[in-house]
Amino acid sequence: MAERVTVPDMMNAREARAQAQRTLLARYPGAAVVCLCMNIAGPVKRTENIERAFAWGAAQVKAVLAPYETLFDAAIHEKTGPEAMICVRAEAKAVKKRLCALEDGEELGRLLDIDVIAPDGGKISRTDIGLPARRCLLCDKPAPVCARSRAHSVDALFERANAMIDAHFEAAFAARTAENAQRALLCEVAVTPKPGLVDRHNAGAHNDMDVFTFIHSACALRPYFENCARIGLAHRGGDATACFDALRVPGLLAENAMRRATGGVNTHKGAIFSLGIACASLGMGYGAPLDVHETLMRCGAMTGAQMHKELEAAKAGQARTFGETIYQKAGIGGVRAEAAGGFASVREIALPRLEAGLSAGLPLNDAALCALVALMASTQDTNAVRRGGEDGAAAMRGEAQALDGEIVRALEADELQQKIGRLKERLTDWDVRMSAAGISPGGCADLLAMALLMAFCEEDEGNGGNEGNEGNA
């Protein structure tokens, strides 16, 4: 794709563009013509990176022009660079003002070369609408001054443009990953009815938190998740354990942010650990097609050595936390074992059940309930052990296994949609009993949030990428 162009190539492309503009003005009298190209120095005008930035730019231009009637919209992708031609029924100067706001308001907008042609064929300039010349990409002086004096090499300008493109999409990826993590936490608490857990109906077995406490916490944690994704991006191609080490201090700061938001209540300590690792793993995998199995296994590579070390220390009588004490007494590894194993419960149980429920036609709430029941049936939840003892946790698991068996049979018979109402009634009754007993499967709730995060990232991938609303030209 990175074919070099000559001066005659560019001159021919410019003339073809001018002819297309004249044709559109003749076809649509009184309309304004918008032409989008990329401001890329040098003989290489079309690469995968440039096309990616152009797709983003075209989507933004169309969003800006959305209030106007679009009369024509087409794009070409030649070696001289991608171009879009859009004709709208609008006053040309008003259009130019809007598009200059795009060019000046977004960092990547500096690479967009947007011309607006008035009905008389004249090009509306920035000075026509009272704006100064655009700034140089390298020194921030007026770009025309640097261009005339050739103050910078073509290679330096080309390198800077590509760095800007990379930075934009990496930032968009990190922001979108954080949005999905926050969305996962909000959806997890919204899933109702959940036995013993905070949901939209009640606070379950908890007397120090409710659904609003969770909302406050999830909002406070979004910057942390974005930071985790950025840390993963910075460790692409590097040591996974070093990436995990880099998460430790941000994780402690996130716990502090959570407690500030909740008045000291621990709503998401487990999710700070699990989803933080997941966001970093997603960052480490950036640039390749999303593979959830690989993403979760990379979580194991990141944490495995340290988690095994902590569990072995607990076994040797050096337990520092309740989770380590449980491992010392009962051999239940909890979230440490889950992480070290690449979150097998998410890969093999929660996510497949969530996807099966959605495929069966269930709404997200009900599919997530099915996934939660499957987790409660198959995992040893240290939070349930802490609150209900080993016997209480075992009883919870047994009841979940019975209910999960019914869900599996309903799925196999293609009857889950018909039976989900009755299953939810049983979950409501179970919630009353679990709440009265003070048992809360918080570890399973965190794993459900992990499954939701992976599902949302897969959804993004299916919609064209995990980079926000960059769109396609």
Region locations from a protein language model:
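Phosphate-rich cofactor/ligand-interacting catalytic cores and adjacent structured alpha/beta frameworks
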Residues: 163-240, 244, 282-432, 473
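Short, hydrophobic/aliphatic alpha-helical segments
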Residues: 247-264, 423-437, 455
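Short glycine/serine- and small hydrophobic-enriched flexible loop segments
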Residues: 223, 277-284, 452-459
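Asparagine/serine/threonine-enriched low-complexity, disordered tracts
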Residues: 460-472
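Long, hydrophobic/aromatic-enriched structural stretches that serve as scaffold segments
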Residues: 227-284
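Short, conserved charged micro-motifs
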Residues: 46-47, 92-99, 290-294
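Long, contiguous binding/interaction regions
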Residues: 1-63, 77, 97-170
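Short, well-structured hydrophobic secondary-structure segments
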Residues: 33-91, 209-236
